[in-house]
From Swiss-Prot:
GO terms for biological process: glycolytic process. Pfam families: Metalloenzyme (PF01676), PhosphMutase (PF10143). This is Probable 2,3-bisphosphoglycerate-independent phosphoglycerate mutase. It comes from the Bacteria. Catalyzes the interconversion of 2-phosphoglycerate and 3-phosphoglycerate. Gene3D superfamilies: Alkaline Phosphatase, subunit A (3.40.720.10). Its EC number is 5.4.2.12. It catalyses: (2R)-2-phosphoglycerate = (2R)-3-phosphoglycerate. SUPFAM superfamilies: Alkaline phosphatase-like. HAMAP family: ApgM_B. InterPro entries: Alkaline_phosphatase_core_sf (IPR017850), ApgAM_prokaryotes (IPR023665), Metalloenzyme (IPR006124), Pglycerate_mutase_ApgM (IPR004456). Pathway: Carbohydrate degradation; glycolysis; pyruvate from D-glyceraldehyde 3-phosphate: step 3/5. Belongs to the BPG-independent phosphoglycerate mutase family. A-PGAM subfamily.
Length: 399
């Protein structure tokens, strides 16, 4: 038996007036996901436990089959694992976003949480400049992918409250600055970064090219190294993870899965879908399980871009789900779990903890009478609700 998870990050949403009361999943053309829903088991899963932030970290841990209440320590330690950055027991990792802040009516607002979806090469250039000026034995900066980078505070503080920048798009940053023990050190670093970035040659170059420049860092998502059982210990399977996002790769590292990096995987609508599909099917020749993650719908949700979200969903269906369904046939016995991790509603431009629609499919499953297709309402109407999202993995394995 071969198993594959197809994860459309942030794919679920709310009914929208612009779509005649439909959600993007209902409005998008998704014949392959619809076919799975009509022949498989469809329902809703609550991937974010009550009281936990509805982040991709918590939600993806659930879909991997891990109870976040038992192993979640924060987002950035997972990203550090993906990047090969070792954390001592007293070290605290932070996500570093390259952002654009804009003066508006006497305050600074979060204009763009991704600095115009800055490229990986440009992001590396800036983080290396920041490390050169601001890096010390205590604070160290590591380049990642696109706008997503890492800082480690050696023997650092961990009790402060921080806010994800994508949660405050268009809002003043003043009421959202870090608070609590150690917060003043983080604010100092963010302020110092503005001097480095505003004086970097890249700032003027991006302005001249009509692009949004990075003019600050934003620190968030902190935590210490987690303790997790390996995927093989937990489920008795070998596996691999395919994603452009360090967070998801990091969960794979902590779970002892192979992390497969695909050239051209960007975490955006221009990602290399075909390369991911090829890598997934090749990995299943050697492994029992693959987790194939696509970030594009989530990025469209954060940007509030309906056109991009519809395109991301349709590309996910046509360029990932369809080819995977066809490619799995050669294995004979297989199961596919297709799901978002959490909703990222266009109206809110951030995540919610609402249950997500999932479909569990195998080539042997029979017709589902009355199921219209794969979307939030069809999943709700089916009446199946998995209250503990981490049990989706047990359902997939029939345990």
């Amino acid at each position: 038996m071969k198993y594959i998870v197809l994860l459309g990050d942030g794919m679920s949403d709310e009914p929208m007036q612009e779509l005649g009361g439909k959600t993007p999943l209902q409005a998008a053309r998704t014949p392959h996901m619809d076919a799975m829903a009509r022949r498989g088991r469809i329902g809703l899963a609550r991937t974010v436990p009550e009281g936990y932030p509805p982040g991709s970290d918590v939600a993806n841990l659930s879909v991997f089959g891990y109870d976040p209440r038992a192993c979640y320590t924060g987002r950035s330690p997972l990203e550090a694992a993906s990047m090969g950055v070792e954390l001592g027991s007293a070290d605290v990792a932070f996500r570093v976003n390259l952002v654009n802040l804009a003066p508006t009516r006497g305050t600074l607002v979060m204009n763009d949480y991704s600095a115009g979806h800055i490229s990986t090469a440009e992001g590396r250039e800036l983080i290396e400049a920041i490390q050169g000026v601001m890096g010390t034995d205590e604070f160290q900066f590591y380049p990642g992918v696109g706008y997503r980078h890492l800082m480690v505070w050696r023997n650092g503080k961990c009790g402060m409250t921080v806010v994800p920048p994508h949660d405050i798009s268009g809002q003043s940053i003043l009421e959202h600055l870090p608070k609590g023990e150690g917060a003043e050190r983080l604010i100092e670093l963010m302020n110092s970064s503005q001097l480095v970035l505003n004086n970097h040659p890249q700032y003027r170059r991006r302005l001249e090219e009509g692009k949004v420049p990075a003019n600050s860092i934003w620190l968030w998502g902190h935590g210490k190294a987690p303790r997790m059982a390996s995927f093989h210990e937990k489920f008795g399977l070998t596996g691999a993870v395919i994603s452009a996002v360090d967070l998801v790769r990091g969960i794979g590292v902590c779970a002892g899965l192979d992390v497969i990096k695909v050239e051209g995987a960007t975490g955006y609508i221009d990602t290399n879908y075909e390369g991911k599909v090829t890598a997934a099917l090749e990995a299943l020749e050697a492994h029992d399980y693959v987790y194939l993650h696509v970030e594009a719908p989530d990025e469209a949700g954060h940007g509030g871009n309906l056109e991009h979200k519809l395109k991301a969903i349709e590309d996910f269906d046509a360029r990932v789900v369809g080819p995977i369904m066809a490619g799995m046939e050669k294995f004979g016995s297989y199961r596919i779990l297709c799901t978002p991790d959490h909703p990222t509603p266009l109206r809110l431009k951030t995540h919610t903890d609402a249950p997500v629609p999932f479909v569990l499919f195998s080539g042997e499953t029979s017709e589902n009478a009355g199921v219209a297709g794969y979307d939030e309402e069809s999943a709700r109407s089916a009446g199946l609700v998995v209250e503990d999202g981490f049990r989706l993995m047990e359902m997939m394995l029939d345990r």
